[in-house]
Structure formats: C-alpha cells, structure tokens
Amino acid sequence: MLAAAPLLLASGNGFATTGPAAKPAVKPVTESRGEILSLSCAGCHGTDGNSSSVIPSIYGKSPEYIETALIDFKNGSRTSTVMGRHAKGYTGEEIHLIAEYFGNLSKKNH
C-alpha cells in the first residue's frame, strides 16, 4: 500500500486535498435578451428600428403592434417575402421579447 501512495497522490486520488476551485470571473450581462435577439433585425430595420431604406421602420410602434405583426408573419396570415421566414425561427416568448425591446425604445430615448 505504501508503494502505491506516491501514485495515488500524483494522480489526485490520494488523501491530499485542496481548497475549492476558484470560480471563473463572469462578465455581467448588460443587454436584455430581447436586445440580443433584436440584433438579427438590425440589418434591415436598423439598430434602433428606424430604417433608412424602403424597409418599414418599427421605431415608435407599440410592443403590441410589433408582436401581432410578428405572429401574423409567423403563421402566414400576413404575407411577406422575408419576414415570414424570420418569424418562424422564433418562439412565442422570443417574439414577445423582441416586440418589447423595439416597442419600448422610443420611450427610453425621450
């Protein structure tokens, strides 16, 4: 048994113990989940929802309006070329979070 002791200690399976492992530093999340999800919208609608092209602006629209539009795109009751495909990729909860984020931007900027 004594001959095996150095092997056990070297492998970490011996009697020697150390303190608890240090926890890695965690960077706090500063963005909301809705803000993170909205990043895929920014390419067409702008980072703040205020489009500078022929794509409709969603800045200033209510969360309810945006959520209803996304749900309608998702279920096909509102026709589109691209939005239906995007909306189908989101859960109902994610659609709600995106709508809340964009719908409340104009309130934050005043």
Curated annotation (Swiss-Prot):
One of its GO terms (cellular component) is periplasmic space. Keywords: Electron transport, Heme, Iron, Metal-binding, Periplasm, Signal, Transport. Dimer of one cytochrome and one flavoprotein. This is Cytochrome subunit of sulfide dehydrogenase. Residues 1-16 form the signal peptide. Monoheme cytochrome that function as the electron transport subunit of sulfide dehydrogenase. GO terms for molecular function: electron transfer activity; heme binding; metal ion binding. Heme c binds at residues 41, 44-45, 83. PANTHER family: CBB3-TYPE CYTOCHROME C OXIDASE SUBUNIT FIXP, CYTOCHROME C4. It comes from Chlorobaculum tepidum (strain ATCC 49652 / DSM 12025 / NBRC 103806 / TLS). It is found in: Periplasm. Disulfide bonds: none annotated. PROSITE patterns: CYTC (PS51007). Binds 1 heme c group covalently per subunit. It comes from the Bacteria. InterPro entries: Cyt_c-like_dom, Cyt_c-like_dom_sf, Cytochrome_c_Oxidase_Subunit.
